[in-house]
Amino acid sequence: MIRRVLENVATAGVIGAAGDTLMQVREGVTLASQLDTGRTARLVSFRMCHAPVVDAAWRFFDARIPFKGIPGVLARVFADQGFLMPPSITLFFVSQSVMEGCTLGESLFRAKDGFVPAALKCLPFWCTVHCVTFGIVAPRYRMAWASLCAVAWNAIISGENQEAIRRELALRELADANLQGRESEV
């Protein structure tokens, strides 16, 4: 059991680093020295903590969802997206924001702001992936399979986090401009 947890943690961490690096290259980073290693470390930290929880939930679904064949696959996909996706996305945004030095209030705002755009991308992506996860892949290899697919997902969710940061900065600039305008009126 401990070996399985360690394998899942290592797999998710390595592949999380690859996904974030891919996103940074997509965003225009051309030299290794330009990579935001702190950003990558934050994403890897989340993925390494998240993987064992997801694996335990999948084992629970296997034990508790009695359906076989296509109905069983669909039930597990819906369970994954219904029970794991909402807290996973929320915790992703909160954890990234807190590790960036934001307050809990700012972190919760980011989670609220980023949840819907991320969920709208998450559902079609992971529902498709998990039809394979729960329909074809042996339970022992599910985390490796999902982690490989997560290369693309990590790039997407990392990009969503960067968009949320940009929206936060724009709101702060607007608030500062409004405050300065009010001060000049006094």
Regions found by a protein language model. Name each.
Residues 2-29, 34-102, 111-166:
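Alpha-helical transmembrane segments of eukaryotic organelle membrane transporters
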